[in-house]
Swiss-Prot record:
SUPFAM superfamilies per UniProt: E set domains, p53-like transcription factors
UniProt domain IPT/TIG: residue ranges: 586-683
Region (Disordered): 15-179, 203-362, 695-721, 827-869
BP GO annotations: brain-derived neurotrophic factor receptor signaling pathway; branching involved in blood vessel morphogenesis; calcineurin-NFAT signaling cascade; cellular respiration; cellular response to lithium ion; cellular response to UV; dendrite morphogenesis; heart development
One GO cellular component term: nuclear speck
Inducers of expression: Up-regulated by BDNF. Induced by calcineurin in ventricular tissue.
Domain of life the protein comes from: Eukaryota
InterPro entries: Ig-like_fold (IPR013783), Ig_E-set (IPR014756), IPT_dom (IPR002909), NFAT (IPR008366), p53-like_TF_DNA-bd_sf (IPR008967), RHD_dimer (IPR032397), RHD_DNA_bind_dom (IPR011539), RHD_DNA_bind_dom_sf (IPR037059)
Protein name, entry field: Nuclear factor of activated T-cells, cytoplasmic 4
Listed GO MF terms: DNA-binding transcription factor activity; DNA-binding transcription factor activity, RNA polymerase II-specific; DNA-binding transcription repressor activity, RNA polymerase II-specific; RNA polymerase II cis-regulatory region sequence-specific DNA binding; transcription cis-regulatory region binding
Gene designation per UniProt: Nfatc4
Covalent cross-link site, Glycyl lysine isopeptide (Lys-Gly) (interchain with G-Cter in SUMO2): 689
Residue ranges, annotated region (2 approximate SP repeats): 213-293
Length: 901
């Protein structure tokens, strides 16, 4: 902080503000003329070491120009007058000799002093009153260019009101900080007087600027507010001075002791001159708290010159209500701080009152703070303490005085108690509107009405509650668009009455022990509410036309003693309540069987609802493109049918030659546009039945004449394969007769070894000696194998294959060769003759892969099957049997036809 430290020199200063214009004339001297020290009032003739008399009249100061906009001041610059400088917020001080002309060359030097913000308050009872009286010293008679804020007369000087202050109580928000030129080298008495002059006014302001002070925020100042402005919120009023200011009043002339904090208020002033310090919370200040600075020093003794708090001061504005001009932000901040008071480190107040010793001095601010806190803010409620039942698995045990709400999830069974719906309602029910008559009670699927029973309790009658619940994927809750409707009449056997629980209509019935705690629900209908009434409710997001499925929800509270009950609940199957249900669409719930042979003729029983005497059952099949390919109506047995069951005969499928199951569909029709949803059904291929062979492990084709095997047939496991085994020849890949027969070819090698061994499970025929033939036949493979001796296949003997037709002309059964039929279910199975020793030549009739082993052939994908017609991967035993039986029964003989290559 700049200072002028010159002995026996007289200090004179001039304040120059923003605009570069000459100040108005001060007197006869004209502009720029300096006053002699003799004519200068004592308050402006500040000789170092000489105290300033309090009663002196101040010198007239030129009226300042309008304030410059902006948050920061420009740097110092030379002023038109010689020896002066212009600066904001700095002040230029011209030092000259005693009585010398300030304008003389070399008469003094210019020191630039920055703006000093005074933090002390004067104890003088009244400031100088001659300032406002000498209005001619201001040039135009107006005290300031800055009018005080509306509704607050004490924030700025009010001319004409005695007791107006010469000093602005907010140095940071006023551009005329008159006493800001003091330096550390100034006279202690002068500093004492000046500081106490300001302190008296600041204390008066602080006494009313508490937590909920009615004074406006410093942000309402004409000058733009900056974070450095010291007028932040103060603490509650108290009688002592701030500890950082007390040294100004107690120190003697000499070195000034250091302050524990900066001299600028910076929002840390919390006390006024009206009582003892109060217990302030650390949260009351934005920049610090008393708790951060250690113990508070004892308050100083009272000074002789203290303003009476009851006397009007410059900050007292009689005509303004206390809270008219308080900005909302000020009150909101005060409310926040007031709410935080109980968390203070110091003893909290009791019942909203401050500690003893402060009630008299701050009763009004305290009451105002309490009122504002109640108006602006609501106390945050404590967290809800959920019961253990809601936290841990929805326990169904409740108090009788606190039954669960209707949307509370409840189990249907708890320990030995169980609420069960013995008879479910139908899947459709036409709900009625409020403007139309009743549609009757909800009916059950097999006829009658739903039945509900409580198991595990039969001590005394209980009340059964029923309401309409939702049927969507969300949790079960009361339906917004449907409510239960009480049905009465001579045909209704169950007594009931309606009740309303949380806005939901509930139907209550009685479960009697003499009825085994069961109730026939013949008194409950469904009422449809108007969509617009529900959709316009606050917070309702569901749409009525998309929520037409409901459930019947039943609930019972079983007493357990000790004021406890166990609540169990059961919900029915979904019920469609849309108007389409008025068409009584048929519904299929179960049916048996689900598959049948393509020949049909079996009996099919359907179970469902809404079946009529003239209901039809139609089977259909659609192609991959969705087009209808087959449609057939089944014959319904009317004598064995009812409203809930239909008995019919499955029709015959259109294609009986299918080799794999066929998926079709059927539906029940009660007339035009009254069809049930389609149900799937499967037609299976015809199964060719085979007679068992003498050996239970062998099954083959029956023959019409002669025993099928000779005595020399060996059924031992097959020998290891030999290189010339023919596996890829198409003759081995055709398991059934389809096109024709092949012809014999010359033998590859003679039979010299023992009889061939047969693999178990093969369809085998005996062979006789002769030549070996190999031809590509689509249906059957004639592989003559020589036998050393065969009672059926010897020379001139003939073995009948059991075929329903004669072989072609080139085929001669008496030849010493008879064809074996390869097993279609064992791809690598065949009748293996033993090749001659050392024979390794591959015959011309075999393909290149014939010499591979069985394991290699299996890995390579070689297999017998229907490679020309049906893939082998999806073939089944039933399909193969059906195909073989079909071809054997209807295959025409084609003599002389050459098999395909």
């Amino acid at each position: 902080m700049g200072a002028a430290s010159c002995e026996d020199e007289e200090l004179e200063f001039k304040l120059v503000f923003g605009e570069e214009k000459e100040p108005p004339p001060l007197g006869p001297g004209g502009p720029g003329e300096e006053l002699d020290s003799e004519d200068t009032p004592p308050c402006c003739r500040l000789a170092l070491g000489e105290p300033l008399p309090y009663g002196a009249a101040p010198i007239g100061i030129p009226r300042p120009p309008p304030p410059r906009p902006g948050m920061h001041s420009p740097p110092p610059r030379p002023a038109p007058s010689p020896g002066t400088w212009e600066s904001q917020p700095a002040r230029s001080v011209r030092l000259g000799g005693p009585g010398g002309n300030a304008g003389g060359a070399g008469g003094g030097r210019v020191l630039e002093c920055p703006s000093i913000r005074i933090t002390s308050i004067s104890p003088t009872p009244d400031p100088p009153t001659s300032l406002e009286d000498t209005s001619e010293t201001w040039g135009d008679g107006s005290p300031r260019d800055y009018p005080p804020p509306e509704g607050f007369g004490g924030y700025r000087e009010a001319g004409g009101q005695g007791g107006g202050a010469f000093f602005s109580p907010s140095p940071g928000s006023s551009s005329l900080s008159s006493w800001s030129f003091f330096s550390d080298a100034s006279d202690e008495a002068a500093l004492y007087a000046a500081c106490d002059e300001v302190e008296s006014e600041l204390n008066e302001a602080a006494s009313r600027f508490g937590l909920s002070s009615p004074l406006p925020s410093p942000r309402a100042s004409p000058r733009p507010w900056t974070p450095e402005d010291p007028w932040s919120l103060y603490g509650p009023s108290s009688g002592g001075r701030a500890p950082e200011d007390s040294w100004l009043l107690l120190s003697a002339p000499g070195p000034v002791p250091a302050s524990p904090r900066p001299a600028s208020p910076c929002g840390k002033r919390r006390y006024s001159s009206s009582g003892t310090p109060s217990s302030a919370s650390p949260a009351l200040s934005r920049r610090g708290s008393l708790g951060e600075e250690g113990p508070e020093p004892p308050p100083p003794p009272p000074l002789p010159l203290v303003r009476d708090p009851s006397s009007p001061g410059p900050f007292d504005y009689v005509g303004a209500p206390p809270t008219e001009s308080i900005p909302q932000k000020t009150r909101r901040t005060s409310s926040e701080q007031a709410v935080a008071l109980p968390r203070s480190e110091e003893p909290p107040s009791c019942n909203g009152k401050l500690p003893s010793g402060t009630e008299d001095s701050v009763a009004a601010p305290g009451a105002l703070r309490k009122e504002v806190a109640g108006m602006d803010y609501l106390a945050v409620p404590s967290p809800l303490a959920w019961s253990k039942a809601r936290i841990g698995g929805h326990s169904p045990i409740f108090r009788t005085s606190a039954l669960p709400p209707l949307d509370w999830p409840l189990p249907s069974q708890y320990e030995q108690l169980e609420l069960r719906i013995e008879v479910q309602p139908r899947a459709h029910h036409r709900a009625h509107y409020e403007t139309e008559g009743s549609r009757g009670a909800v009916k059950a699927a097999p006829g009658g009405h739903p039945v509900v029973k409580l198991l595990g309790y039969s001590e005394k009658p209980l009340t059964l509650q029923m309401f309409i619940g939702t049927a969507d994927e969300r949790s079960l809750r009361p339906h917004a668009f449907y409510q239960v409707h009480r049905i009465t009449g001579k045909m209704v056997a169950t007594a009931s009455y309606e009740a309303v629980v949380s806005g939901t209509k509930v139907l209550e019935m009685t479960l009697l022990p003499e009825n085994n705690m069961a109730a026939n629900i013949d008194c409950a209908g469904i009422l449809k509410l108007r969509n617009s009434d529900i959709e316009l409710r606050k917070g309702e997001t569901d749409i009525g036309r998309k929520n037409t499925r409901v459930r019947l929800v039943f609930r019972v509270h079983v007493p357990q003693g000790g004021g406890k009950v166990v609540s169990v609940q059961a919900a029915s199957v979904p019920i469609e309540c849309s108007q389409r249900s008025a068409q009584e669409l048929p519904q299929v719930e179960t049916y048996s069987p689900s598959a049948c042979s393509v020949r049909g003729g079996e009996e099919l029983v359907l179970t469902g609802s809404n079946f009529l005497p003239d209901s039809k059952v139609v089977f259909i099949e659609r192609g991959p493109d969705g087009k209808l390919q087959w449609e057939e109506e089944a014959a319904v047995n009317r004598l064995q049918s009812s409203e809930v069951t239909l008995t019919l005969t499955i029709p015959e499928y259109s294609n009986k030659r299918v080799s794999r199951p066929v998926q079709v569909y059927f539906y029940v029709s009660n007339g035009r546009r009254k069809r049930s949803p389609t149900q799937s059904f499967k037609f299976l291929p015809v199964v060719f039945k085979e007679e068992p062979l003498p050996d239970s492990s062998l099954r083959g084709f029956p023959s019409t004449s002669g025993p099928p095997f000779g005595p020399d047939v060996d059924f031992s496991p097959p020998r290891p394969p030999y290189p010339s085994y023919p596996h890829e020849d198409p003759a081995y890949e055709t398991p059934y007769l389809s096109e024709g027969f092949g012809y014999s070819t010359p033998a590859l090698y003679p039979q010299t070894g023992p009889p061939p061994s047969y693999r178990s499970g093969l369809r085998m025929f005996p062979e006789t000696g002769g030549t070996t033939g190999c031809a590509r036949l689509p249906s059957v493979s004639f592989l003559p194998r020589p036998f050393p001796g065969d009672q059926y296949g010897g020379q001139g003997s003939s073995f009948a294959l059991g075929l329903p037709f004669s072989p072609p002309a080139p085929f001669r059964p008496p030849l010493p060769s008879s064809p074996p039929l390869e097993d279609p279910f064992h791809p690598q199975s065949a009748i293996h003759p033993l090749p001659p020793e050392g024979y390794n030549e591959v015959g011309p009739g075999y393909t290149p892969g014939e010499g591979a082993s069985e394991q290699e052939k299996a890995r390579g994908g070689y297999s017998s099957g229907f490679r020309d017609s049906v893939p082998i991967q999806g073939i089944t035993l039933e399909e193969v049997s059906e195909i073989i039986g079909r071809d054997l029964s209807g295959f025409p003989a084609r003599p002389g036809e050459e098999p395909p290559a």
